[in-house]
Amino acid sequence: MNEKVRIGYPPSRVWGCPTTAMWVYRLGAEKAKQMLFTGDLISGTKAEEIGLIFQSVPLEELDATVNQLTNRIKGVPKNQLMMMKMMVNQAYENMGLANTQTIATLFDGMARHSPEGIWFKQRAEEVGFKQAIAERDSGDPIQGSKK
């Protein structure tokens, strides 16, 4: 990932829940809560530092870095790659990934149909999506939310 890219999940402030739930598995509970409770964006450098991504590099090095990694991986026999992928995926399944993703999908739908979610949709219709996003991501309290 480019070190200057910003990554996060701003819809966690209102109108969404990340359905993959990978934040918890990649970051642990505390950092995942911080990211999701605030909806803040972080740089690629910070994302690497906290373990959200594998590596961040300057934009001008991105293609070469990706090519180097893919060339390294493609030298491994396919059956070996398949077994390693299945083993890692099974470990996530054993930790409850599928169940977590199911409930996250339900919560995503609920978030979009909550009073705050409905307010956000109506606000976007009134002022346009770009302005509604700017208001949501400003850090100010969400209108109509129950505190």
PLM region spans:
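CoA-thioester-processing core
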Residues: 1-35, 65, 69
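C-terminal long alpha-helix characteristic of the crotonase
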Residues: 1-5, 12, 54-102
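Short Gly/charged-rich anion-binding patches and loops
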Residues: 18, 42-43, 61
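Short aromatic/basic micro-patch
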Residues: 26, 41, 56
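Conserved catalytic core of Hanks-type protein kinase domains
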Residues: 26, 38, 75
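C-terminal alpha-helix plus adjacent terminal tail
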Residues: 43-44, 75-147
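Structural motif
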Residues: 50-51
